[in-house]
Design a protein with these regions (language model features):
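Mid-to-C-terminal alpha-helical segments outside catalytic/metal-binding sites
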Residues: 31, 133-169
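Charged helix-capping and loop-helix junction motifs
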Residues: 18-29, 47, 96-104, 128-132
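Conserved, mostly hydrophobic/aromatic
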Residues: 6, 32, 66, 78, ...
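Active-site metal-binding loops of divalent metal-dependent hydrolases
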Residues: 7, 43, 67, 83, ...
Length: 169
């Protein structure tokens, strides 16, 4: 086992009672602490509760917001707590300018890229089933948001992911 997650709160569809989601999320954070494992968080339409629970339970030293969907305010709140941000194909969507602002302010050692395959295919593959190989489009989107070359994003995100997950140890 290399991490706890993905876990967290999803209020978008309200398929699960929120009080139970909060209770289970707190227990998952406790487990990450007990096992000294990274925590991979999924949060959707639940930022305030997510941060409240993290503050109450204590954020594990290695915590990443997988498929980060927030804007600059949520990014700052996560980064100030020591969390990492991981960007998916959403970064390429025309409807995501605030997400691109968040990517621009993430420190070089605090962001990663991902696909969230089979979901959220990046532009120009939007509407299709996503594939891991399309992470290059995500990298291009992050590079554009940060105003850097895609090779810089590849190097920074690989270094961050390697450190975060203990790859190559």
């Amino acid at each position: 086992m290399v991490a706890i997650g993905e876990c967290g709160l999803d209020y978008h569809y309200d398929n699960s009672p929120r009080n139970i989601q909060r209770e289970i999320f707190a227990k998952q954070i406790q487990l990450a602490h007990q096992r000294a494992l990274p925590l991979v968080i999924h949060t959707r339409d639940a930022w305030d509760d997510t941060f409240d629970i993290l503050d109450l339970e204590g954020i594990p030293s290695k915590t990443v917001f997988h498929c980060f969907t927030g804007g600059p305010e949520e990014a700052e709140a996560g980064l100030q707590r020591g969390a990492y941000l991981s960007f998916s194909g959403i970064i390429t969507f025309p409807s995501a300018p605030e997400l691109r602002e968040a990517a621009a302010l993430a420190p070089a050692d605090r962001y990663m890229v991902e696909t969230d395959a089979p979901y959220l295919a990046p532009v120009p593959k939007r509407g299709k089933q996503n594939h891991p190989s399309w992470v290059t489009f995500v990298g291009e989107g992050v590079a554009a948001a940060r105003g850097v070359e895609v090779e810089t994003v590849a190097a920074e995100s690989w270094s961050t992911a390697s450190d975060f997950y203990g790859l190559g140890d």
